[in-house]
């Protein structure tokens, strides 16, 4: 790290500092101050501080000779020769040296950066992530990295972090996790040897863009070792253990400031600054929507809580990708070896879509219900719910998935061609807009009255689904991570009012954690104001929930009058019987 940057950070240039080295006649006020200081018995006139450039600190009684006044301008002028194009700290001390954000008020990992770039660098280093340039791929002509851009090249952003002086050895080493099978880009199971290869390749990736080789030893996992429970990373349907979002309390460190939540009168809580290793919140107590109080004070490292949140995001991503893989196998002619190529964000491509046939459409069938059952069984703390609560969450998951998955698939492969893509890969052309079936004389277009009745029951719902859900949702331009978190959040939210008291406590805890994860995902992406983006996603829940309710009412009518021959499980789900 540049010593000039540290010098600028700890000793910013001020007029008072510069005047002490200039030949300016002292003012009467300064003489009075000097006299008062000289008359004080505690003031040592023989004190001459010295500056140790090796450690960038002032020390009394140092063996180094005191600095001379004519050497100071040379030190300051060296700021213009920053390594690898690093921005000069004297140009704009509050500007991020990575994305030029004006919110870089302090140093992060040795370089001046905003919180978003610091979070990006921390996660990249702690997870040993390597990136490929989305632009030309030429490091001499990097992509533009600016905080106002929605999509920033991660490869070029990481290089700029290194150029800004951010050092990987200052990032806390990632704790040892429970060994589980993780799907890689080729569908392989991670082994110990592969982990070593990944670590060595990551070292080569970082050292390619750094001038100094990493010589600091890696931190060994010790008493603050974090373990992820098996029920969280690889949930078992037979398991009844809830998701443990807490971490093992480590010993206190007096030198690390953080925020501690302590109980207060009533249900309110207040924050006080303490010297500990605690995070700004406890996930188990983060919700204020259910009764309870903190019985004891716990101290958790902030980085462990953040890792928990990112692992929760990865868990929901894997769960949704697994559901997409099942649909890809069920509804397309794809080959099995193509399923494991990468994370499946959308199971359908344009050439795999089929025209919608209202005559044979019957909604979810048995294999669809099995897919949703596997999907919802992976939800954290789902196994801790009561049987009736599981029934409610599963039913709501079927309804939400049917509508929201259709909106997301339409956004990915259908909106540009003005198509509504259904959950099973069927599409409906919306240009020209199809008739609803209620127009005068529309019955003459159908062979039988039964076909006309089925069409005018289904098509108005599909038209409303396209114009009131698919189009507004496409305008959000959600990422895959935002989509999977929003979907899980809506399932928990819409199920809340039918759950028992214990189920509502679990639901509130999961909702709060998902909202925190949404904010972290948006913040890491580099949005200028993550709160606004999260607010837009939360506001979309209103029209999504409205469409889910409209679909449920429509299917109730269709099953009651036998307009559509639905699966027997559909009749059972729409009955809402608890026993």
Curated annotation (Swiss-Prot):
Q: Which Gene3D superfamilies does the record associate with it? A: Erythroid Transcription Factor GATA-1, subunit A, Retinoid X Receptor
Q: Listed GO cellular component terms?
A: cytosol; nucleus
Which cysteine residues pair off into disulfide bonds? none
Answer yes or no on keyword Transferase. Answer: no
Where it sits in the cell: the answer is: Nucleus
Residues in the DNA-binding region are: 93-173
Major localization class? nucleus
InterPro entries, alphabetized: HNF4-like_DBD (IPR049636), NHR-like_dom_sf (IPR035500), Nucl_hrmn_rcpt_lig-bd (IPR000536), Nuclear_hrmn_rcpt (IPR001723), Znf_hrmn_rcpt (IPR001628), Znf_NHR/GATA (IPR013088)
Q: For the NR LBD domain, which residue ranges apply?
A: 304-577
Report if keyword Manganese is assigned: no
Which stretches are tagged as biased composition: Low complexity? 233-242
Return the similarity comment.
Belongs to the nuclear hormone receptor family.
Q: What is this protein called?
A: Nuclear hormone receptor family member nhr-22
Organism, scientific name:
Caenorhabditis elegans
């Amino acid at each position: 790290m540049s010593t000039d940057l540290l010098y600028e950070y700890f000793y910013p240039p001020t007029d008072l500092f510069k005047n002490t080295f200039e030949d300016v006649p002292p003012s009467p006020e300064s003489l009075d101050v000097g006299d008062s200081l000289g008359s004080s018995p505690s003031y040592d006139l023989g004190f001459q501080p010295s500056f140790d450039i090796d450690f960038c600190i002032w020390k009394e009684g140092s063996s180094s000779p005191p600095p001379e006044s004519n050497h100071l301008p040379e030190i300051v002028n060296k700021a213009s020769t920053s390594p690898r194009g690093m921005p000069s700290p004297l140009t704009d001390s509050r500007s991020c040296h990575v994305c030029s954000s004006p919110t870089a008020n302090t140093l992060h990992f040795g370089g001046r950066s905003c919180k978003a770039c610091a979070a990006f660098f921390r996660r990249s280093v702690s997870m040993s992530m390597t990136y490929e340039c989305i632009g030309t791929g030429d490091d001499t002509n990097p992509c533009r990295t600016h905080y106002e851009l929605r999509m920033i090249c991660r490869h070029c952003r990481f290089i700029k972090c290194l150029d800004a002086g951010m050092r990987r050895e200052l990032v806390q080493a990632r704790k040892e996790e429970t060994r589980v099978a993780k799907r890689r880009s080729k569908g392989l199971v991670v082994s110990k040897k592969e982990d070593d290869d990944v670590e060595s390749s990551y070292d080569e990736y970082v050292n390619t863009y750094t001038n100094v080789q990493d010589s600091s030893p890696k931190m060994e996992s010790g008493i603050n070792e974090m373990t992820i429970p098996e029920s969280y990373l690889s949930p078992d349907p037979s398991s009844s253990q809830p998701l443990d979002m807490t971490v093992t309390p480590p010993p206190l460190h007096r030198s690390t400031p953080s925020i501690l939540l302590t109980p207060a009168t009533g249900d309110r809580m207040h924050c006080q600054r303490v010297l500990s290793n605690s995070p700004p919140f406890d996930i188990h107590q983060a919700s204020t929507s259910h009764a309870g109080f903190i019985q004891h004070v716990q101290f958790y490292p902030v980085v462990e809580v953040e890792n928990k949140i990112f692992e929760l995001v990865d868990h929901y991503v894997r769960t949704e990708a697994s559901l997409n893989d099942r649909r890809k196998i069920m509804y397309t002619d794809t080959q099995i070896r193509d399923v494991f190529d990468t994370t499946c964000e959308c199971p359908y491509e344009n050439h795999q879509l089929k025209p919608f046939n209202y005559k044979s459409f019957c909604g979810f069938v048995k294999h669809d219900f099995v897919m949703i059952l596997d999907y919802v069984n992976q939800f954290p703390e789902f196994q801790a719910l009561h049987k009736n609560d599981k029934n409610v969450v599963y039913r709501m998951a079927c309804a939400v998935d049917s509508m929201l998955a259709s909106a997301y698939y339409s956004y990915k492969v259908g909106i540009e061609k003005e198509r509504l893509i259904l959950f099973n890969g069927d599409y409906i052309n919306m240009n020209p807009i199809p008739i609803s079936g209620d127009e005068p004389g529309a019955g003459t277009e159908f062979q039988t009255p039964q076909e006309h009745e089925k069409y005018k029951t289904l098509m108005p719902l599909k038209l409303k689904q396209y114009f009131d859900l698919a189009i507004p949702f496409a305008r959000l331009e959600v990422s895959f991570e935002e989509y999977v978190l929003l979907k899980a959040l809506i399932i928990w939210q819409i199920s809340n009012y039918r759950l028992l008291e214990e189920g509502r406590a679990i639901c509130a805890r999961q909702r709060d954690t998902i909202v925190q994860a949404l904010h972290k995902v948006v913040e890491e992406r580099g949005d200028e104001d993550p709160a606004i983006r999260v607010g837009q996603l939360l506001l979309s829940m209103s029209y999504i929930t409205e469409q889910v309710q409209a679909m449920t009412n429509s299917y109730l009518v269709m099953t009651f009058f036998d307009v559509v021959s639905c699966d027997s499980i559909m009749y059972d789900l729409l009955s809402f019987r608890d026993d």
